[in-house]
Structures are given as structure tokens and as C-alpha cells.
Amino acid sequence: MLNFTFDKRINMGQATNSILMIRPINFGYNEETADDNHYQNKDSIIKNPNETAQNEFDNMVNNLKQNGISVHVFQDDENDYTPDSIFPNNWVSFHQNGDVGLFPMYAKNRRLERRPEVLEFLESEGFTISNIVDYSSAESENKFLEGTGSMILDRENRIAYCSISNRSNEDLFIEFCEDFEFTPVIFNSFQSVGDKRLPIYHTNVMMCVATCLLYTSPSPRDRTRSRMPSSA
């Protein structure tokens, strides 16, 4: 049995206690994003991916609430075909001062996710939106920056990381950093696809910034000694 002791002095400033989740209605393989998202599997053995996603979604909401996280669920609808709507962090970002970022999306069916009703819902839930910075017009120039999929934000130290790809434009990233007062860190990352090395489509696929809790396991000898009765 493992016994964990958590230091209450740990800074949890990289985490949030309130999140937005979009409950999917058309979740599944997305033809429009598959050309550079090589993690998708068109031949998945899951017969009803949307039903499976909804069940997993509902379980996650319950688990988060049971652990003290405030979850604000917005129900997607069938008016538009949005198979990736469960990932709202790609088109919107929220910031502690009330600023909101809206981002240009690579796939046309993902642009449909960028709905004012979502922000109106959050305001009805008591959130204050003081300023919206909208980068979505860059879609007309085929420039994209898909929110905190493209960028990893170190909110405590005001550093932003971005791995350049079709969905993560360097100029837009620098513009975001200037607008939101982050120091940019730009790099490239790759994955093997067949015999090719191709850019990883989203930075958050390969890195994150979070609070790290480290458990140090005693050596086998120490564990044995702890179970041995003491002798004179």
C-alpha cells in the first residue's frame, strides 16, 4: 500500500478550479483534420464513437465534480457537423483578468465550433468577460493558431511555448504573446509517420506545463527492513 503526503505549500497556480466542457453530439473521425493529425484512426473498432464519448464525458464530469472542480457543461447540438467540438480549448482561451482569445481554425468544420452562445452561456453562469481578442480573421490568409492546442501557457511565469505546424503560425503566435504579455518560446517537433518525419500538429500533444507531484519509492531493502520486527 502506498501512502502519499501532500505538501500544502505546493503552488497550484498552473491549475484551475473551474472548467468549460462541451458535451459532444457528433463525435467521431474528422476527415478535415486527419491529413496532419496522424493519431486519428479511421478504422477504429468502436462501433458507436459518439455514444462512447458521451459516456466517458459524463463520467469525467462526475469525477471532476466529486473532486471539487466546478464544471460548466454546454450541450452541443445537431445544427452543424462538429465532430471535434469536445475540444473547445482549440478555439477559445480564458484568462484571469477576464480577457478571452478567439482563434483561427485549420479545418472548416472546426470553425463552426466558435459560437457566441458558448460565451453567453458562461456569462449566464456568472463569468465576467471584459475583453475579446479575436484572431479568427487570419483564416482568410490561411494562417492558424489553435488556442491552447497550439500553445502551452505557463501562466505563472508568463511564458508561452509553440511548436510550429500547419495549425500553429509563428507570426500569429508572436502577436498573441504581445497582446497577452507572454514571452514566446518557438521550436519544432516531429513524429514518425511511415518512413517520414512530419511536424506534430499540436504542441499540447507532446508537452504540458503543470504542477508535478513526485513520489519517491523506498528501495526494496528499506521496504524489507520496515516490515521486520525490531530485536534487542
Predicted regions: what they are:
Residues 12-13, 85-94, 145-155, 200-211:
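Structural signature of eukaryotic scaffold interfaces centered on beta-propeller domains
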Residues 67-110:
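Long, hydrophobic/aromatic-enriched structural stretches that serve as scaffold segments
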Residues 215-232:
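Single conserved hydrophobic/aromatic residue that forms the stacking wall/gate
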Residues 1-75, 97:
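N-terminal leader/transition segments
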Residues 183-193:
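Blade-edge beta-strand/turn elements of extracellular beta-propeller
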Residues 79, 104-156, 161-171, 175:
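Intrinsically disordered, low-complexity linker/loop segments enriched in Gly/Pro
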